Amino acid sequence: MNQLLTFYPNRIIIIRKWCESAKSYFVGTYLKGICIMENNVIILAGGQGKRMKTNMPKALCNVIGEPMLEWVLTACENAELDDICVVKGYEGQQIEDYLARRKSKADICTVMQEERLGTGHAVMQAADFLKAHAEGNTLILYGDAPFIDAETIKGALELHTEKDCGVTVVTSRVENPTGYGRIIRTENGISGIVEHKDCTPMQLAITEINSGCYWFKTADLLEVLFDIKPENAQGEYYLTDCIELLIAKGKKADAFISANPHVALGANDRRGLLALNDIARYEIIGKWLDEGIEFCCTDGVSIGNNVTIGHGTKIHSGVILRGNTTIGENCNIGNNCIIENTTVGNGVNLNNVQAYESVIEDDVKIGPYVQLRPNSHIKKGAKIGDFVEIKNSTIGEYTAVAHLTYIGDSDVGSNVNFGCGVVTVNYNGDKKFRTVIEDNAFIGCNTNLVAPVRVGKGAYTAAGSTITTDIPDNALAIERGRETIKEGYAEKKLKARTEKFEAIHGKSEEK
């Protein structure tokens, strides 16, 4: 081969290109000849949850700072499902608004369920979605059952496709199955689901329960969906009736037992929602303990489902980590920090910090009592001290903002030093303007920088100055009134105050 490369390099290249072209041709031709199955999902999120006593859909009630619907959407996206249809109902516009704000990985559409007439009726509203994806499989699950996970979804789909099932029910084994539908198994799969109130004494002993999560062959589901009848006391259309109809048509039905013991859990009232929060909090902290993260005390600690934490990091009491937050390695997250949708680098030390939608680079020290408002970027090695607020600003490498300072709408260079009490005056009552402070500048105590203004490289501002014009590189700017001294002024003021006091209260007796 080496000789060929030496004497016929161009021919080798031609042969290689021909092989790559042939491979693309054969692979492309093969794919055109087969049907690629889509795996899509319908999420039922139309419930009101009257016992929650809230004016929002139940699926938007929070578990560890995230709507239950978000937990479900995240699981579906992590399972790499294709398209998602959310069935909305009560206060459906709130569902629309939430999805519009969300950065989704999958394509998401919504349909409206005007009347809440059961789970089967909810799925009927998504009939057009089902017909558009009739060649694949469809997962149906509740938007207010937050503990469904990607591993369960993928495991159930694998069983569903391997056994060529018309329907596969996701189930769980629990110690106390009270209130849940029981799974009736046969040698070839399952024969049905019996609701708790309809169970015989023998069926009540069954501990395998229905999670309310189902994989259907989409075409099979469409075949029976509109055959279900509201023949029950509630006058509702039950999706579970589709299982019996499919079995009656000779379709195979089976059940996948999830390793997740909480997969079926939901909440109907505030007590139930609090219980879900406690479970989620305990499970997530346990996961990070297993990853080697040190928790000095778990009191008040809350970590969101989408948070990641690097090795060697220490978490103290009262810490709340929410949203798409990433904490790097060997960090110290001190007491009472709230970090939301923020990226934190390695070796960062935070103490009583609130940070929202910001970036904190490596080896930064912040706190105590610091707020980073959205779009703040603190670069490597910077130090932000007590009682500082930063908003929509970049703080350069190794810059020090020691205390009692407001920096808003500013671009700050590296190795800048801020004295105590500096304010970037960014708002004139109508518009906001930016302040630029270049590398190695020194901003004296109680300086007001009235934007738009630029402080040049290496420039100084004298303490107490109000800066309204640009400062050249390496210059000193002093903008304050000259000090005036009035001799004897205090004695005159004291005499006047004494006379006024005596006129009101009388002359004091001399001792």
Residue ranges of predicted features:
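Short, positively charged and aromatic/hydrophobic N-terminal segments
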Residues: 6, 12-14, 20-29, 33-34
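N-terminal nucleotide-binding beta1-loop-alpha1 segment
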Residues: 37-54
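Conserved core of the sugar-phosphate nucleotidyltransferase
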Residues: 93, 148-233, 240
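Conserved N-terminal catalytic core of the sugar/cofactor nucleotidyltransferase
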Residues: 30-40, 66-141, 147-158, 162, ...
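Conserved alpha/beta core of the MobA/IspD/sugar-nucleotide pyrophosphorylase nucleotidyltransferase superfamily
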Residues: 207-310
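Structural signal for interior beta-strand "rungs" in well-ordered beta-sheet cores
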Residues: 294-478, 483-484
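Short catalytic helix/loop segments, enriched in acidic residues and glycine
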Residues: 55-71
